[in-house]
């Protein structure tokens, strides 16, 4: 018989997550897990792919998949068009949540916090290392706006290519980076019988508090 959605499941038995072996702050654990994901989640899977959830001014949630482009003790960095739908949502409510899922490792990381724009210098530095086509696309595409058809987009790209025929495209003012400043990071490790390990880090005035959550 064909498998139904109700029948689709897998058991997890690869590893565990113990408080005694976990660091007191979350960033070193994220770096460790991400390094392991880089080794196991082979292309075409992108280990730095994440879902990013935002909320608009009416309280309606929106979610999409983006690529993480930087992480340090300040937070998690991604780039976008500031005039896009997500840009408008972050302007109205500067908070977001992101989730990484690495199925080979049976792991998930959830991150929540306030979002700020990175400096123009950071945005420009990243923009300059992007492929030429991506840089031209940032100028050409009116992201999230309704367009007539694919032909209109190709026409906009052709105009942009003509504009920058004799010069390298610089970072447009409507494009740049955001940094999510985490106040909560949860590490999830799949375990047998759905009794998963969940270690949650929440930021308090005195620093990070580590706690185990029931699955």
Swiss-Prot record:
GO molecular function ontology, one term from the record: FMN binding
Catalytic activity, as annotated: pyridoxamine 5'-phosphate + O2 + H2O = pyridoxal 5'-phosphate + H2O2 + NH4(+); pyridoxine 5'-phosphate + O2 = pyridoxal 5'-phosphate + H2O2
One BP annotation, GO: pyridoxine biosynthetic process
Coiled-coil intervals: none
EC number: 1.4.3.5
InterPro entries registered for this protein in UniProt: Pyridox_Oxase (IPR000659), Pyridox_Oxase_CS (IPR019740), Pyridox_Oxase_N (IPR011576), Pyridoxamine_oxidase_dimer_C (IPR019576), Split_barrel_FMN-bd (IPR012349)
Chain positions recorded as FMN binding sites: 64-69, 79-80, 86, 108, 143-144, 188, 198
Binding site for substrate: 9-12, 69, 126, 130, 134, 194-196
Cofactor: FMN
Cofactor note: Binds 1 FMN per subunit.
Enzyme kind, highest EC tier: oxidoreductase
One Pfam family recorded for the sequence: PNPOx_N
Top-level division of the source organism's lineage: Bacteria
Family recorded in the similarity comment: Belongs to the pyridoxamine 5'-phosphate oxidase family.
Protein role: Catalyzes the oxidation of either pyridoxine 5'-phosphate (PNP) or pyridoxamine 5'-phosphate (PMP) into pyridoxal 5'-phosphate (PLP).
Name this protein carries in UniProt: Pyridoxine/pyridoxamine 5'-phosphate oxidase
Organism of this sequence: Azotobacter vinelandii (strain DJ / ATCC BAA-1303)
